[in-house]
């Protein structure tokens, strides 16, 4: 993504009060924080199957989208917004949780597979390509073995952050918001050099 190219920022998550603050919804949490920082509110947009707001990122206006389709159908909302606004896929950035990354770590990528994430799988299916930018936000994995991970995945991603974890999440989301400005001003590669090396204070497990 070239500097100034970002036009659509999508946070992945599940709708409803039941899922507020859960690990799977950290993409929503990032957009909520950005909207609060910019003093804007999300409004329902049925044609996009989601909630939408608009903010300035760098010197450009960027639309924020939180699909309300549930995670497995996120791609429907993304496709609808891309088509309605006449955007190219390289103007899109998706914010998504990642169990393969420790809590506190970030990975900015220009493309890639779904990596087992149903929201990304839906986006790839509806966009017809995996060549779109995504910022993976680490939420850590449950357990120490593959068996424990499989058994506890659902409860982990649908669980809320502990009080101590929430302190790290605050730092991470601040870095994400700073990173969005870097992406818009400097482009994906230079922004990624910083974001991918980020480590929050007090995070020995990162």
UniProtKB/Swiss-Prot annotation:
Biological processes, Gene Ontology terms: protein quality control for misfolded or incompletely synthesized proteins; rescue of stalled ribosome
Top EC category: hydrolase
Residues with site note (Discriminates between blocked and unblocked aminoacyl-tRNA): 14
UniProt superkingdom: Bacteria
Primary location recorded for the protein, binned into one broad class: cytoplasm
Keyword Hydrolase: yes
UniProt entry keywords in alphabetical sequence: Cytoplasm, Hydrolase, RNA-binding, tRNA-binding
Enzyme Commission designation: 3.1.1.29
Cross-referenced InterPro entries: Pept_tRNA_hydro, Pept_tRNA_hydro_CS, Pept_tRNA_hydro_sf
Site (Stabilizes the basic form of H active site to accept a proton): 97
One MF annotation (Gene Ontology) recorded for this entry: peptidyl-tRNA hydrolase activity
Localization (cell): Cytoplasm
SUPFAM superfamilies: Peptidyl-tRNA hydrolase-like
Active-site residues, record numbering mapped to chain: 24
Residues where tRNA binds: 19, 70, 72, 118
Catalytic activity: an N-acyl-L-alpha-aminoacyl-tRNA + H2O = an N-acyl-L-amino acid + a tRNA + H(+)
CDD domains, alphabetized: PTH
Subunit structure comment from the entry: Monomer.
Similarity comment text for this entry: Belongs to the PTH family.
Function, in words: Hydrolyzes ribosome-free peptidyl-tRNAs (with 1 or more amino acids incorporated), which drop off the ribosome during protein synthesis, or as a result of ribosome stalling.
Protein's name in the database: Peptidyl-tRNA hydrolase
């Amino acid at each position: 993504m070239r500097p100034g190219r970002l036009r659509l920022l999508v946070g992945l998550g599940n709708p409803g009060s039941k899922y507020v603050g859960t690990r799977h919804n950290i993409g929503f949490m990032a957009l909520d924080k950005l909207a609060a920082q910019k003093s804007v509110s999300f409004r329902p947009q049925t044609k996009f199957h989601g909630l939408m707001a608009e903010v300035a990122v760098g010197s450009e206006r960027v639309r924020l989208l939180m699909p309300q389709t549930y995670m497995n159908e996120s791609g429907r909302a993304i496709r609808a917004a891309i088509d309605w606004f006449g955007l190219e896929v390289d103007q899109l950035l998706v914010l998504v949780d990642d169990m393969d990354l420790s809590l506190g770590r970030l990975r900015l990528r220009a493309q890639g597979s779904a990596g087992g994430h149903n929201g990304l799988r839906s986006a790839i299916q509806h966009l017809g390509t995996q060549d779109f930018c995504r910022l993976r936000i680490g939420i850590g994995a449950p357990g120490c073995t593959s068996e424990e991970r499989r058994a506890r995945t659902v409860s982990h991603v649908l669980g809320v952050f502990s009080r101590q974890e929430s302190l790290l999440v605050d730092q991470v989301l601040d870095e994400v918001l700073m990173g969005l400005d870097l992406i818009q001003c400097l482009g994906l590669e230079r922004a990624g050099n910083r974001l991918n090396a980020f480590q929050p204070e007090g995070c020995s497990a990162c």
